[in-house]
């Protein structure tokens, strides 16, 4: 990557047809967990969330925090340890079990009656509940509303053709006075088909502008050695804060 390249040099690409038609099945995502192809998992947690955590929480206690497509995100324990109630949804049962195991948390599991074949895993302390089902099955389960949403590796993982449906689910979960922190990736989508998918600014506005004020908090260089195999020479992560209009 050219070190002289600045953030302002990076062109915002319109979303491309090759990504719009790209589809990953739930089975393919589950296979990634089985074969441990989970380069998206961050063992130390997300640096930008860590940096903006206090501003995100605003000193409030007892918040309900939602993690869409949560995987085994270590940040779930961060929030639980601060006295908040965490709910996540993840298609991979393996990912959910690994979360509880790696965080040394005992848990119980029970079927979700509204969604055949789905389960919910609950920490023994009762402050973390992870639903093993499709995000699009969630409206059938009454999980209530949330004060905070941490969306990292979720919107960028949803098939582009499903984004409107996804945004509708997210907006339906927001409680009055919410804060929705959203991390997306910016790269040349003509060189990498995704996932993770490229989500341009215009798409975020189209999906959320009707109900949310949208503020870009930060844009950072996220390029790593592994990204070379994607055929790209730059990738930036952008952090947005969505609040009530």
From Swiss-Prot:
It comes from Oryctolagus cuniculus. GO terms for cellular component: cytoplasm. GO terms for biological process: methylation. S-adenosyl-L-methionine binds at residues 29-40, 69, 90, 134-135, 152. Belongs to the class I-like SAM-binding methyltransferase superfamily. TPMT family. One of its GO terms (molecular function) is thiopurine S-methyltransferase activity. It is found in: Cytoplasm. This is Thiopurine S-methyltransferase. Monomer. Pfam families: TPMT. Substrate binds at residue 40. The modification N6-acetyllysine is found at residue 58. Its EC number is 2.1.1.67. Keywords: Acetylation, Cytoplasm, Methyltransferase, S-adenosyl-L-methionine, Transferase. InterPro entries: SAM-dependent_MTases_sf, Thiopurine_S-MeTrfase, TPMT. The lineage of its organism: Eukaryota, Metazoa, Chordata, Craniata, Vertebrata. It catalyses: S-adenosyl-L-methionine + a thiopurine = S-adenosyl-L-homocysteine + a thiopurine S-methylether. It comes from the Eukaryota.
């Amino acid at each position: 990557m050219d070190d002289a390249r600045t953030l302002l040099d990076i062109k915002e690409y319109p979303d491309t047809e090759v990504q719009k038609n790209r589809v990953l099945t739930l089975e393919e995502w589950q296979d990634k967990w089985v074969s441990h192809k989970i380069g998206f998992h961050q063992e130390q947690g997300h640096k930008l969330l860590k940096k903006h955590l206090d501003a995100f929480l605003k000193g409030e206690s007892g918040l309900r925090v939602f993690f869409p497509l949560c995987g085994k995100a270590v940040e779930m324990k961060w929030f639980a340890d601060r006295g908040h109630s965490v709910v996540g949804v993840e298609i991979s049962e393996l990912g959910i079990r690994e979360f509880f195991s790696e965080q040394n948390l005992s848990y119980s599991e029970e079927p979700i009656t509204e969604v055949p074949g789905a389960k919910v895993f609950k920490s023994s302390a009762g402050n973390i509940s992870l639903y093993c089902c499709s995000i699009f099955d969630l409206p059938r389960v009454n999980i209530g509303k949330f004060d905070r949403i941490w969306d990292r590796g979720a919107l960028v993982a949803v098939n582009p053709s499903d984004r409107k449906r996804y945004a509708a689910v997210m907006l339906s979960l927001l409680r009055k006075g919410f804060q929705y922190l959203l991390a997306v990736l910016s790269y040349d989508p003509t060189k990498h088909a995704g996932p993770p998918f490229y989500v341009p600014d215009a798409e975020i506005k189209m999906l959320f502008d009707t109900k949310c004020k949208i503020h870009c908090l930060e844009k950072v260089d996220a390029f790593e050695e592994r990204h070379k195999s994607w055929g790209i020479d730059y990738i930036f992560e952008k952090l947005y804060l969505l609040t009530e209009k």
